[in-house]
Regions:
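N-terminal hydrophobic/helix-forming segments and targeting peptides
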Residues: 1-334
Length: 334
């Protein structure tokens, strides 16, 4: 499973450009699913047939945050904007990978006072990307306006701690893949959406829900942990204590029956878990809840350190226990 996470996390896949990620997912799921399709917004939807006639859905978004080229100056430096909700600070001094080149993000300033002011009031208005070009024409050949880029960081393992860009939400994709690999003759038909464009507003999920209309849906995503020095103490989520069963975030309140069933199954099976109330953000569960007349939806999260940085960090035990809990749910929860 670690190798699957590595391949997914290192893949290039900003919002709207998820094709490489989907290719890896289909390679991993060969001989483990009964069918798959792509919809018109690029969602990859796979399924495993069950016996009950009921449909349960798991969702993990396949996109990652990134940057998009908005302008190129006469000396070949790129101006950029975010793809997804991320502040500028994690990008300073970082490498960014575009399909045909790699660049370095930095901050402009003509004097030391300029630099100090720009660092203090950091925004993409005063940042640029250096791709080693010397002119507009040279840069235009490899990174024209509209080109998407992502962090250029590599997977790292420290014991059972796993670190990479794009754990949000490639670790969720890996969880869903493992669930499908381990499910034999499921009771319920299990649909899984590897949805697109979550980071810019849950766009893929808004479509996938209408397509499947399951009895219940669980989004698998990351959540910010509070176990680092001076972390946000209103959050209870930590690494190594199991998947987090979400009650609420800023975008949705999880279906109470699903939450109660997840707790019941975890306790019956001895699966460690923790409860989550997130004071920010949201997941695809919000989009599924607003689909047609509504889909009962909830989120199960992987606690994660350093979300939306090049070094998002998760723990293998939480991932494995998330898989175990979801297998119990898709078999018994609906």
């Amino acid at each position: 499973m670690i190798e699957t996470i590595r391949k997914l996390a290192e893949a290039y896949g900003p919002s709207g450009r998820e094709e490489d990620v989907h290719r890896i997912i289909l390679e991993e799921l060969k001989n483990h699913i009964d069918g798959y399709k792509f919809d018109r917004v690029g969602n990859l939807i796979v399924w495993k047939d069950g016996k009950s006639g009921k449909k349960v859905m798991l969702d993990a978004h396949s996109d990652e945050i990134g940057l998009v080229v908005t302008n190129i100056d006469k000396n070949g430096f790129l101006r950029v904007e975010t793809v997804g909700g991320v502040p500028p600070h994690p990008y300073v001094g970082q490498r960014v990978k575009f399909p045909q080149c790699t660049g370095i993000v930095y901050v402009e300033g003509e004097t030391s006072q300029d630099m100090k002011k720009n660092f203090s009031n950091l925004s993409f208005d005063v940042m640029y990307v250096d791709i080693g070009a010397s002119s507009y024409e040279e840069a235009q050949k490899v990174a024209p306006i509209g080109t998407f880029g992502v962090y250029d960081s590599r997977f790292m393992q420290n014991g059972d701690f796993l670190t990479s860009k794009a754990m949000d939400d490639r670790v969720g994709c890996a969880v869903v893949i493992e669930v499908l690999k381990r499910l034999n003759s499921p009771n319920n038909t299990v649909y899984c959406s590897f949805s697109t464009q979550e980071e810019i507003g849950l766009m893929g999920a808004r479509v996938a829900g209408y397509d499947i209309m399951p009895e219940a849906c669980i989004a698998i995503d990351v959540t910010a942990s509070s176990d680092t020095p001076k972390a946000f103490k209103r959050h209870a989520m930590v690494l190594k204590k199991g998947p987090a069963i979400k009650v609420k975030d800023r975008a949705s309140i999880s279906d109470r029956k699903i939450v109660d069933k997840l707790i019941e199954l975890a306790e019956e099976s001895g699966i460690p878990y923790q409860m989550e109330v997130l004071t920010m953000g949201g997941t695809n569960a919000a989009a599924f809840q607003a689909t047609a007349s509504g889909i009962a939806s909830a989120t199960v999260s992987i606690p994660t350190r350093y979300v939306h940085t090049p070094s998002e960090t998760v723990h293998l035990d939480d991932i494995k226990n998330c898989v175990n809990l979801l297998i119990e749910y898709v078999q018994k929860g609906v």
